[in-house]
Amino acid sequence: VCIPPQVCPALSDERRTDLWGNADNFVNTMNHFMASMLTPSLQVAMNELSNHDHSRFLTRTNHIVGRVAQLGSKAAEEGINLAVMREAVAVQMTWVGAPTVYYGDEAGVCGFTDPDSRRTYPWGQENRELVEFHKEMIRIHKREKPLRTGSLKMLSWSSNVLAYARFQEGEQIIVVLNNSKELKEVTIPVWQAEVPMKGKMERLMYSWEKSYTTERDIYLVEDGETVVNMGKHSVLIMKPVREMQVDEYGKESSSN
């Protein structure tokens, strides 16, 4: 059966350079389509970066559009950007929905659209750093309740930059992305996600052009905002620091 691209965009080879780094388009598009779904449906919708009908996401990071029959399989592996791939995985694991990894994405499998996207799993030749990054992001997703059932709020966006929050019942996760080739200083109005006006945020994950880290770092919140310096093609995931308090009866409680 021949399905026209207008019906199934996954089969399209369209190249839209005008949308590269267009955060306005991303925010408006996501808001538009998410508004058509009820919350229970959104929470179980599969968040996929790749599938059997589309080119592999890692291949899409090289901005080469085409088919394996014309370009050859090697072209799908040239000029790929693992930092952009990690950005995408971070969004996949922190967005509303059920993160769904197409086999091999976690191992660095490349490929143009079907049939090239169905390459075999690279046993013994996996990109181990990418595999470990997926494991870390899965741990964060499983550990942080707002990432599973929390609300979503866009906090700030501009060309190549996006910050959003997942939050519920006094818990917040803040995600910041810089998808540009430049260093960026980003001011985030975290108060909009019910983060206290003054306090601290702790880093859970930071990925940049060279690698990633889960080492803890602290960011100050002043007047409901926090300022972060973002590297090239980077993503930062953080949450408020909860200070333990002891009441007059010796009972501990946490607060931001």
What are these regions (language model features)?
Residues V1-D114, K142, L152, S156-S159, ...:
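Conserved alpha/beta catalytic core and glycan-binding cleft of carbohydrate-active enzymes
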